[in-house]
Structure formats: C-alpha cells, structure tokens
UniProtKB/Swiss-Prot annotation:
GO BP annotations listed: animal organ development; canonical Wnt signaling pathway; cell fate commitment; neuron differentiation
Domain of life of the organism encoding this protein: Eukaryota
Keyword Transferase listed: no
InterPro entries: Wnt, Wnt2, Wnt_C, Wnt_CS
Name of one Pfam family that matches: wnt
Predominant subcellular localization, coarse grouping: secreted
Spans traversing the lipid bilayer: none
Family stated for the protein in its record: Belongs to the Wnt family.
O-palmitoleoyl serine: lipidated positions: 212
Protein name: Protein Wnt-2
Residues carrying a glycan: 295
Amino acid sequence: MNAPLGGIWLGLPLLLTWLSPEVSSSWWYMRATGDSSRVMCDNVPGLVSRQRQLCHRHPDVMRAIGLGVAEWTAECQYQFRQHRWNCNTLDRDHGLFGRVLLRSSRESAFVYAISSAGVVFAITRACSQGELKSCSCDPKKKGTAKDSKGTFDWGGCSDNIDYGIKFARAFVDAKERKGKDARALMNLHNNRAGRKAVKRFLKQECKCHGVSGSCTLRTCWLAMADFRKTGDYLWRKYNGAIQVVMNQDGTGFTVANKRFKKPTKNDLVYFENSPDYCIRDREAGSPGTAGRVCNLTSRGMDSCEVMCCGRGYDTSRVTRMTKCECKFHWCCAVRCQDCLEALDVHTCKAPKSADWTTPT
C-alpha cells in the first residue's frame, strides 16, 4: 500500500521542477493591440515563431482572435462572479491575469480551456460572416441528407467549426508544443477540452418550406450555440476537474488519487491545489477579497461568511436609479418612472494585520 504513495511523493519534486514559470499565453494580450497586422504581430510579447508566422500570414484571423478575447474573458468573469477569485484581468500584464495562473491550479485549467474555446468560437463566427479570406461556410454541408424527421437539403451557411478548431490548435497550442514540461502537457490537454466543448454544442437548425408552413421541404444548416452554453459546460468541468500527476516516463498523466477515474479528453486536469484567495498575495497573484461585495442572505460562495473568509463585512447605504410604476400603453409600449431606491451594500473587510500585502 505504501509503494504507490511513495512513488507519487518521490516524484513530486521532479514534477514541480517541470512546472514552467513561463506559462501565461501571451496571445491573450492581443485584445489590446491595434489593427496594423505588423505592429500587432511584432509587439505582442512572448509569441513563438510559429505564432508570429500565422499572425503575419492571417492578419484578419488575428483581428477575430483579438476581438474574441473580450468575449471569453467576460464569460470567465461571469462564471467566477460569485467566487473569491473572479477572473480579474490586469491591463498592463501581457499574460492578462498576472501571476495567479503560474500555479497549475484548477483556475488555470479553466482559463486555458475557455480561452481555447473562445478562439474556436471567434474564428468560426468570422468565417460564417465572410470576414476571413481563408475560410467561409462549411463546404462539406451540401446536397441532401437525412435525420430523424426525414430528408432535408443542406442550405444557408453552416458554421465551419472544423476550420476554427484546426486554426485554434495550430495557433494556441504552438507555444506548449515547444515545451516538454508537465505544465505544457496540462495546458495542451485543457486547450483541447475547450475546443471540443464548442463543437459539442453545434446544433442543426432548419427552415420549413411549403404551403402554410407544412414543411414538405426543409433547408438545414449547422450553427454554434451561444457561447454561454460552452461557458456553463466548462464551469461544470471546472467543478469536477481531476487532479493528476505525471506518469513515470513523462508522456502523460495519472490520477493523483487512485479512487478517482482517469480523466477523459473532455475533462479538465490540474496539478496543484488552489490558494484560498482570501488575502492579497503579490507572489501568488491573488488580489484578495477585501472590498468585494458579498451577499448577506446567501449560503453559497458569494455569502459574506465565505467571500470575506470570516473577517466580517462593512455595510453602506447607497441609492440607485431604478424603473418603477411601469404601465402598459396600448399599443405597444411600457412606460416607467425613474425612481431612487435605497439599499444596503455589504463589502468584505480587509485583514486586520498591517502586513497583509506583500511589499513591493
């Protein structure tokens, strides 16, 4: 019984030396660049040669990726909105999230997955909207096909998600493929899980043709679901993420706890336990929860007890403008008055210790 555990602990120092400190995906910083392809490609720090090649060759795709960064970071912040770490970004950091993702935690796993998914979504959408020279609608969706409802014709514009996945794999994975360390393998696994998540929610939409909508003829196409579907799915995967260690030959993972199942390609994996994110810690990249708004009546992660880590909270009375006395007017409008509403806002207290922040 002791041998397997001993093997894990003896391998831990080696594992930690394999966890590269340079893990931030520098392409995330593309959200802050301008429209000039050469300026964008040459000034985003940390891109590897393959990424710069793709950047120079496909400036229109890079613009789509850059616009998509705002979308997937917003989705990350939505999913973590009630948690101590709320996916906050740092505008001046080329890694976008600061040092917090240097730890191979489940938060890192989620961010790599959602960012990879965001690239697939942004590129695929741009293809369908005719914004990219290198792709368009899915060329394979032509002719006649069958489903459970009968025969239909492929028509409209099916989202070319295979192109989005192919380009995302080539661009996003390029940096990790240059490394042989454990963290690179972790990132590659979670990147793939993110890409697969987008395709999971590809759905068939159809339009009926015929007298009075009789649907004697159908035209169908494939369309991506709203990105929130992908975000919700990856959030569930985050909550069920599997802690792993490297196998002995350094080519893959094995579960850290033998009682848990082996991770599938759809699961998120991580190496290190997360910090509690209670205290601001510059070294760990944790902003802490001092000043965060908490919910006094909640029993969840956003409750004042959990969010404030037992430090207590301050309450302030604020007023806000709301719509009130709304009435329906025929036809067809709803008209409301603007009213001032007073409410209590609860924010987490800072730690009492004078040295709660790491000195600069």
